[in-house]
A protein has these predicted regions:
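Membrane-interface interhelical loops and short amphipathic "cap" helices
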Residues: 1-5, 31-41, 64-98, 150-179, ...
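Transmembrane-helix bundle segments that line or gate the permeation/cavity pathway
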Residues: 55-84, 91-116, 146-154, 261, ...
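Membrane-interface helix-boundary motifs at transmembrane edges
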Residues: 31-43, 118-130, 202-213, 272-280, ...
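Extended, highly charged clamp/arch subdomains and adjacent linkers
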Residues: 1-89, 98-113, 117-131, 140-151
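Conserved, charged catalytic cores of large soluble enzymes
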Residues: 19-35, 155-157, 187-210, 233, ...
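Carboxylate/His-rich catalytic cores and anion/metal-binding grooves
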Residues: 123-158, 190-226
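Contiguous transmembrane helix-bundle modules in multi-pass membrane proteins
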Residues: 1-30, 36, 50, 57, ...
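Soluble non-transmembrane domains of integral membrane proteins
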Residues: 530-621
Length: 662
């Protein structure tokens, strides 16, 4: 049933692509047949819903095959076995190339159906073109699923009694939600991309498509960011090397579209308010989708080495052709409609909020280009010089850290700038508090013993950002308090709820500050390694870890070598750490490291078991990782900010906005 549903879905998507294009084109002339146009559009809409239904059937069939351990399917055999828990059997759905493509195709069909349901009445002129773009994308993925990478291929020969099993590294709770979260971000951003192209193809220069798809942009950006953080956390607790970000090509593949999507999300505000940055916005969303497909190409082509990639496959060529086609189509549409995209207003001052947003676009684009260059450099060097030169973390840090510091200053200053006007009394009135907090932040970092320049600057600029957010909240709250005699704390809550988009954005900035602080702790990491016997100790900083014992713990599907250490801080016992090495059935050559962490707001005490001996000796890697918990907490704050920003507005909006309308 699953294979049949996939095949029918492919032909339905091709049909939907064709009739959507015909319906969009049929309304171009004054003599167009209105009833024929309506019929074509209605037919394309039915194809969208049918495509979603068929892909749901196919996905349910594959999921059922995993849950019942149907090893007659090659894909189920390769990624599951009978000892695998049902939770990880679900994870196995997207553990391999075929299943992850099916998950992508299903999510794309779901988003297309939801977008059609939500927007077909609000954007009737654009919907046929958007349907054409979405169904064209769906056709591409269904082409791969049916003819290149089929998830329902039969096992060659007699059905085996058991499967090979899931990769041990993927048997982690984070892997249950990390890939789907990333995919929601990737696929969700297809919607604003489709409507942007629709606006170009339909000749619409207004910003209604931005207004209608804003929630898609914000929510997809959030899920993509959460997916990146979940991936970092998985690397931190599962890989055992002590860090969370290695500038691996697949890590970079998710970061690049997040950077350009961040620029797009901010830049569209200027188009909505001032009728500016139209070419910027079209280019940013086109490049965002291009980078999404480029990242998929990296993951599936095997051309660029990565510990996260699926390995070499024939899919790489298909994605290479597809990503350049969508890039050429998008850029050609921008060039074709360039006169329509002329700005309605122009920058009136180099020191205004509009100029700050322009600089924001440039900075995020520069960051994305740097990551793109570093990721592709090994391939480019091999093509041009015959030698594959790998770019390490040092390159990314040297180039990106200064750019990121400039970005932090911009985030801190931008809310204080006025629209259109040059620097005036507003800035000089509002800037002293953020500057004072910035100085206190730098002094506090230095007084705490930090001597790393970048870390001190991050602490300083983080305080600057918090100061500017505090000023904005205070000014809005005091205006409401004076107007309605409401107590200041309650006024602050009311003003945030009355302008949720704006103040939700400020809460997101607070979350980003926490993430910046967490990242700033990376240069301060301390590490010690050693091999000790039971009752011996290793020391690092003001911690002492006493090795208690080693146990061999067999379970149904694995053997765990478990060690137990007692941790002391300045002579006081603070807890136990239990790092492990695990050996899974059928995967004995792929042992996993299960680290143990004692965490607080200041630092993580991180221990990995790197080796062991039958006589009880054990080798450990012990690290003090400062401020890591700030990363994860920052993600929660960003979630609150996004929730506030996208929550439906009240009908009666109370304005206590500091900046006013332009």
């Amino acid at each position: 049933m699953g294979a049949a549903a996939l095949l029918v879905a492919f032909f339905v998507s091709l049909y939907g692509t064709g009739v959507a294009l015909a319906g969009a084109l049929s309304g171009r002339g004054p003599e167009g047949d209105l009833s024929r146009r309506r019929g074509l559009i209605k037919s394309s809409e039915l194809a969208v819903y049918l495509n979603f239904g068929l892909l749901t059937i196919a996905s349910a069939a594959l999921l059922r095959a995993f849950l019942v351990r149907d090893f007659s399917l090659l894909y189920v055999f390769e990624y599951s076995n009978r000892s695998l828990s049902d939770a990880y059997a679900v994870t196995a759905f997207w553990a391999g190339q075929e299943g992850s493509l099916l998950l992508w195709a299903w999510m794309l069909a779901a988003c297309a159906a939801l977008a059609l349901f939500l927007h077909h009445k609000r954007l009737p002129d654009l919907m046929p073109w958007a349907t054409f773009v979405l169904m064209l994308n769906s056709s591409f993925f269904l082409l791969l699923l049916n003819f290149v990478s089929h998830p329902f291929s039969a096992f060659p020969g007699a059905t085996p009694a058991d499967g090979y099993g899931l990769n041990p590294l993927l048997q982690n709770p984070g892997m249950i939600i990390h890939p789907p979260t990333l995919f929601i971000g990737y696929v969700g951003l297809t919607i604003p991309y489709a409507f942007a192209l629709a606006a170009l193809l339909a000749g619409r220069s207004d910003s209604e498509w931005i207004t209608q798809t804003r929630i898609w942009t914000v929510v997809s950006w959030f899920f993509l960011g959460v997916g990146i953080l979940l991936g970092a956390e998985w690397a931190y607790v599962e890989l055992g090397w002590g860090g969370y970000w290695a500038w691996d090509p697949v890590e970079n593949a998710s970061l690049m579209p997040w950077l350009t999507a961040t620029a797009f999300m901010h830049s569209i505000m200027i188009q909505q308010r001032r009728g500016m940055f139209k070419i910027w916005n079209m280019s940013l969303i086109i490049f965002t989708y291009f980078l999404i497909i480029f990242g998929t190409f990296i993951t599936r082509s095997g051309l660029i080495s990565s510990v996260h990639a699926f390995g070499k496959s024939s899919l790489g060529t298909f994605f290479l052709v597809f990503m350049f086609l969508i890039l050429l189509l998008g850029l050609a549409a921008v060039v074709w409609r360039r006169k329509m995209l002329v700005a309605q207003n122009h920058l009136q001052s180099p020191v205004s909020r509009e100029s700050a947003f322009l600089l924001n676009n440039i900075i995020f684009s520069a960051l994305a280009f740097t990551v793109f260059w570093g990721t592709t450099f090994p391939v480019l060097s091999e093509i041009t010089k015959g030698v594959k030169i790998t770019v390490g973390a040092g390159f990314y840090n040297r180039v990106n850290v200064p750019i990121a510091l400039v970005l932090m200053v911009l985030i801190g200053v931008c809310p204080l700038l006025a629209w259109r006007s040059p620097v005036g009394r507003k800035v000089f009135r509002d800037l002293p508090l953020p500057l004072a907090l910035s100085a206190i932040g730098a002094a506090g970092a230095y007084a705490s013993g930090i001597r790393n320049t970048a870390t001190i600057l991050v602490m300083s600029f983080s305080a600057l950002i918090l100061g500017s957010v505090l000023v904005e909240f205070y000014r809005g709250a005091t205006a409401l308090r004076d107007l309605s005699k409401t107590p200041l704390p309650l006024a602050a809550i009311k003003v945030a709820l009355s302008n949720r988009r704006r103040y939700g954005g400020y809460v997101v900035h607070i979350g980003m500050v926490l993430i910046f602080i967490g990242l700033a702790g990376a240069p301060l990491t301390r590490e010690v390694t050693g091999t000790i016997r039971p009752n011996e100790s290793l020391s690092i900083g003001n911690y002492t870890l006493k090795y208690m014992n080693m146990k061999w713990v067999p379970t149904q599907d694995r053997l765990a070598v478990t060690t137990r250490l007692k941790a002391f801080q300045e002579g006081k016992a603070i807890g136990y750490l239990v790092p492990e090495r695990r050996f899974y059935e059928n995967r004995e050559d792929q042992p996993t490291s299960e680290v143990s962490i004692l965490s607080n707001w200041r630092e993580d005490l991180y221990v990995a078991l790197t080796g062991y001996n039958r006589d009880g000796r054990a080798s450990f890697r012990i690290l003090i990782n400062p401020l890591v918990s700030w990363l994860w907490f920052g993600g929660y704050i960003i979630g609150l900010g996004v929730l506030l920003a996208v929550w439906p507005r009240r009908r009666k909006v109370m304005s206590a906005s500091a900046g006013g309308k332009p």
